[in-house]
A protein has these predicted regions:
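Short, small/polar-rich loop/turn modules that mediate ligand/substrate recognition or access, typified
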Residues: 125
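A short, conserved, highly charged catalytic patch centered on acidic carboxylates
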Residues: 1-120, 128-158
Length: 159
């Protein structure tokens, strides 16, 4: 189990690594980082630093979910089990997508949560974490980026 101080140091290191890439890489190199790379290099270690055991039954990576609105099957990148039937999804995107302007990503993440009747879902590219409501607000293709939006956190380390 990761202690609070160890977790803080791991998160700080991840943010410093990410910020280093952000400042040093050209636009072309930045775009070469795909969703799988973000999960492997940043998100998996980040969630581990928060105390989630990524190889346990409490976390499923690429969790298959049937969408309630059209019956299609998609894969949320993460399913976190809090116990007692409480779960949430996290959907990863490649970095530099500007999640605050891409409503299609928010709608996708919300569909996973809505279909599973989860209260919230997280959309992230590691640079930003956006929290959306899932339960009770059916996602529609024409929804705006802030529909069902709860909060955003930017990945900047402050002690």
């Amino acid at each position: 189990m990761v202690t609070r101080e160890e977790g803080k140091e791991k998160v700080k290191g991840l943010i410093e690594l990410f910020e280093g890439l952000y400042s040093e890489k050209s636009a072309i190199e930045k775009r070469a980082y795909n969703e799988a790379t973000v999960r492997e290099k940043f998100l998996n270690p980040f969630f581990d630093a928060l105390g989630w055991i990524m190889t346990s039954n409490d976390v499923e990576v690429e969790y298959s979910q049937v969408r309630e609105d059209d019956g299609s099957k998609g894969k949320a990148d993460y399913r976190f089990n809090l116990g007692a039937g409480k779960e949430f999804y996290a959907e990863a995107k490649k970095p530099y997508e500007n999640l605050a302007e891409q409503s299609k990503h928010a709608i996708q993440a919300r569909r996973y949560a809505y279909s599973a009747n989860h209260p919230v879902t997280i959309l992230t590219d590691f640079e930003e974490f956006r929290v959306y409501l899932g339960r009770g607000i059916a996602p529609k293709d024409e929804d705006q980026i802030n529909t069902a939006w709860v909060s955003s956190l930017s990945c900047r380390y402050t002690d």
